Amino acid sequence: MGSGSRERIVEVFDALDAELDRLDEVSFEVLTTPERLRSLERLECLVRRLPAVGHALINQLDAQASEEELGGTLCCALANRLRITKPDAARRIADAADLGPRRALTGEPLAPQLTATATAQRQGLIGEAHVKVIRALFRPPARRGGCVHPPGRRSRPGRQSRSISSRRAGPLRPAGHGLATPRRRPHRHRTRPQTRHHPEQPAIRRHVTAKWLPDPPSAGHL
């Protein structure tokens, strides 16, 4: 990246604003369908190249500006000044750390961490969505308890602690007693609730039988 004076930087930004104003005033009615597609392609290329310029500014702010100068953290300063959300500001800071120019402790300029991706962005070949996918591929896996777990596979703390305790309990058993067998839960017998008889129930049954049931036939009627 070439060096420039403050006047040169202001001049370049002013020229860019002027050219964008001219482009905004252009009518595309005379273009054919292939020409309109080509114009959109060139416009997309310009839009993709612009974030590469911001990476250098963000990295310089991150390395040189203090929270007193920024009025808070870099993320909050970008969100307030650029009128964007804090997640968007955090994403831009992360993109700049991977794709922007860097400097060593001795002041020597260093290439971006993702050199090929940064070059493709400066050329307008890839956009924000491409950068997001590429950065996800190079993101290290999350470490938990010193072990790297593959994505989509998590260990349950309770199950892991029980397995470790069961392995440790084996050697602590006295000789001749063998390994400890897992404790079984007591079997729950399903019992039917006992029918409670009312104290007047036999008398009621006799009354109903005598009133509603016919008398048994006598021997003379047989």
Curated annotation (Swiss-Prot):
Pfam families: DUF222. Residues 142-222 are annotated as: Disordered. Residues 182-196 have a biased composition (Basic residues). It comes from the Bacteria. Residues 160-169 have a biased composition (Low complexity). Belongs to the Rv1128c/1148c/1588c/1702c/1945/3466 family. This is Uncharacterized protein Rv3466.
